[in-house]
Amino acid sequence: MAEIVLTPGQRAAVESRGCALLVAAAAGSGKTRVLIDRVLDQVIREGRRVDEFLLITFTQAAAAELRGKLLAELNRRLAADPENRHLQRQLSRVYLAQISTVHSFCAALLRDYAHVLELPADFRLADEQEAAALRERAVRAVLEEAYADPSPAVRAALDLPGAGRDDRALQELIVRVYTNLQCYPDPAATADRWEVMLDVTDCTDPGQTIWGKWLLRELQRGLQSDAAMLRRALALAEENEAVSAYVPVLQANLLLLEALASAGSWEALARIPPDFGRFPAIRKCADPETQERIKRLRTDTVARVRRRLEPFSLQPDETLRELSGSAEALRGLLALTRAFSARFAAEKSRRHLLDYNDLEHFALRLLTDRSGAPTAAAREVAGRYAEILVDEYQDTNRVQEAIYSAISREGRNVFLVGDVKQSIYRFRLADPTIFLEKYRTFAEEPAEGEPRRILLSDNFRSHAEILSAANDVFRLTMTERTGGLVYGDAEALRADRKSVV
C-alpha cells in the first residue's frame, strides 16, 4: 500500500497543537486529506475518539462525503495495523461523530435544549415554499396596518420610489433588510445602530455622514477601475505612432483621476473641475482601428466618471437636506422591518416552525448571555469536543462565528479551513471578511499558544501552465480593495503532481 506523503504545509496543519489554526487551502491543495488526517492523528497519537470532534461542512452532501472518507481512511490504517484495538473501536464511532452542516448541528442542539429556550418539543424546519408564504402574509399584514395609521417616518418609507400600486418592491425591500439583519448576532441591536447612524442633524460636512463616507469609498474604488481603462488606452497610444497625439490628453486625464481619488473630502472634490479636455483631430489616421478603440475606451471611461461624480455636484447644505429626507424614509423602513420581524416570528411560532435563521439565532441565544459570554449550556457543549473543525470557513457569517466562539475553549481549539478566492455565497450573506480578519491577524510563526496561519498552495490537480495562467489572473484582480487581500507569491498556486493526495 503506497505511503501518502504530506507536504510541509499539510504536515503543519495536521500536527500543530495548542492554538487556533486558520488554514488557507487553495483549490486542489488536499484540504479534505488534511481534515481527516488531523482527526486521525489525534485519535492515534493522543488516544482520542472520533466522536470527540465537531466537523462542520457547508452541505449535507459534503458531510456525507467527509464521513465516508474518514471511514475509508480508518479502514486503510487498520489494514496496516490490524491488531490496533483503539482503531477498531473507532469504526463504529464514526457514525456517532458530529459531522454535519452548521444548521444540522444547531437543530440537534435545540432538540436537546428545547426546554431551556421554551421551544415546542415538536418544532420542525419550514421548507422554503412554506417560509416564503409566511413571509408574504406577514409583510402584507404589516403594510396594511402601516397604511391605516402611518407615522411620518413610515409615510416617507411608503413613498419610496418603486413602492408602486401593489407595493411589491417595498415588500421585497422590507424582507431584504430583515434578511440582512439576520446575519448579525443581535439583529435588533444592529437595527438600532443603523438608525443612530442615519442621524445627520448636527452635521455640516456630508463626507462625515455614513452616506458620505460610503460614497467617497465607492468613488475611490470606482476611479481605480476607471484609471485602469485609461492606462490601457494610454498604452495603445504610446505603442502606435499613428495615435501618439492622444498621449498628452490621456496623461492629463489620468492625473485628473488621481487627484479626484486622493481628494478625500466633499469640499476637496468640489474644488476639482472634472475637465477632461478634447482629443486633437487626427486626419486620415494610419491605424483607424486602434484610433477607434482608444476613443471608445476614453469616451466610456469619462461617462462613467461623470456618473460617479453626480452625487458630489450639490452644495454641502443641499446634500445634507437630501440626506435628511432619505434618513427619514430609511427610519420608516427600519420600523416596518421591525414590525415584519415580530409578525413573521409570530406566524412561525403558531405553527411550531423554525427557519434556517431561527436555528442559528436560537442556538446563539442558548449558548451566550446578553453580554455575549458563554452560558452553562455552552460550557456543557464545549466539554463534548476536543476540537471544532470548520470547512469552507470563508462562507461563514457573524452568527455562526459567534456560535463557534461560544463552544470553543477561548478560541484555542478551533481548526478553520477555507479559501477566500472560493467565496461564492455572498448572495446568501456569507461574510468572507471574517476569514480575512483572521488571515491578517494570525501569524505564520506565532509565539506559543498564539493563533497560527498556514497556507496550502501546492496544487495536486492541475498542470503548471494552467496554474500560471490562474495566478496571472488573480494577481491582476485580487487587491486589498477588490478581494480583501493582495495576491502575492505566498498565495500563488504551485504545481505539485508528484504527491498522492
Question: What does each model-found stretch correspond to?
Answer:
Residues 34-48, 442:
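Walker A/P-loop NTP-binding motif
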Residues 30-31:
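Conserved glycine(s) of the Walker
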Residues 6-9, 14-15, 20-24, 34, ...:
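Conserved helicase NTPase motor core
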Residues 164-179, 455-501:
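Helicase-core coupling region on the C-terminal RecA-like lobe
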Residues 1-2:
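Acidic, low-complexity intrinsically disordered tails
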Residues 52, 171-354, 450-451:
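Conserved ATP-driven helicase/translocase motor core recognized via long
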Residues 86-93, 440-449, 497-499:
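Short, conserved catalytic or adaptor-binding loops enriched in Gly and charged residues
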Residues 50-159, 210, 214, 433-437, ...:
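Conserved P-loop NTPase-based nucleic-acid remodeling module centered on helicase motor cores
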